[in-house]
Amino acid sequence: MRYDVVIIGGGLAGLTCGIRLAEQGKRCAIVSAGQNALHFSSGALDLLSHLPDGQPVSQPLEALDELARQAPHHPYSRMGAAAVAALLPQVEALLERSTISLLGSYQQNHWRMTPLGKFRACWLSPVDGVTRGLPDSRFGDNPLIAGIEGFLDFQSRIVAGTLQAQGIAARSDDLKLPVLDRLRQNPSEFRAVNIARVLDRPENRAALVEELSLLANGNDAIIMPACLGLDSPEVVGELAEALGKPISLLPTLPPSVLGLRLHQALSQRFRQLGGMVMPGDRAVRASLSAQEIAVHSHHHRDIPLRAKYAVLASGSFFSNGLVTQFDRVTEPVFGLDVRFAEQREGWSQQDVFVPQPYMQFGAIVDEHLHPRIGGETIGNLYAIGAVLEGFDPIAQGCGAGVSLLSALHVAEQILKEGNL
């Protein structure tokens, strides 16, 4: 099987890179081992919320020079501030072409509400998310935090309590919704995605409107768990129109409706452009030459995927893009050079709430995001997303930005080289 580009990993980075290449007529295949981190995400995208020294960032572009000084191995520092600034409008345009509706701008961070009622700096948020600092922020002065009886993946009382501590007159109550009784009988099935599949049905809309109308009497807005709008995001707007007050959604424990919705939109866009996705398969090894890369997958061991270029978007430890042994960290498909602390005790901190050193382990790359094998740079291989070294996606609030920007950075280079 021959393609222009083979991408290993079907998460945010892999799909974004594939979409950009496919838009320009490149034949792309994505080998995807299974559920990716988007299934566990809030659906919001961060760019840069903190510098490595902990200093908060409100205007990400203004912080790139200082980031390069503090973290020269950070992917943004590798790509360069000028490249990052040039790619950001392209990222937002690509998401819009993928029919993903988001609020925010790379010029200025805003605040999104977390599932515990706190606020975190953010670049782009779902249009039905709970935000502050945007013209469309609308969670009200005395919102109702509406939980669902028996649903353990969202705690409305905790959210209301956190907001009350911030001076917001929030209160909580639970929806009974007998239409969900069948799901309640099996707690393992009483999850956000399954609830959304029930509540999104038109025949169940009237019951939901009736209960919310009663519970929210006297409240100027409603905040619900993200158990709506899985396949039809407009459901939330229709519900708000029926009630006459804004409705916003908060992420739940995984699987996440908002994250899954983002993944579905990107996957659909890639396939519509002619891209090939091989779900449930796993790249196990590869052979390299200057003219071609052959990727062998678990299900197609004897029929390699051949391409002039390969892009590694396999993620970090979470998705086995990086693998730990007792004394080392390795990249399992190509055997890339990986930067990690030589002493095992330097991998982590005892306090789980402080930045962990292992989060910054990853593949060593140059400014073009070419990785190395045995110290030698591989010119037709690229690495993008969470497999890269030099950044902490949690402490620095930059995981989505690294995935999106590195993906487009590499796609543009492949397109330029392919047109020479």
From Swiss-Prot:
Coiled coil: none annotated. Its EC number is 1.1.5.3. InterPro entries: FAD-dep_OxRdtase_2_FAD-bd, FAD/NAD-bd_sf, G3P_DH_GlpB_su. It comes from the Bacteria. Conversion of glycerol 3-phosphate to dihydroxyacetone. Uses fumarate or nitrate as electron acceptor. Composed of a catalytic GlpA/B dimer and of membrane bound GlpC. This is Anaerobic glycerol-3-phosphate dehydrogenase subunit B. It comes from Pectobacterium carotovorum subsp. carotovorum (strain PC1). The gene is glpB.
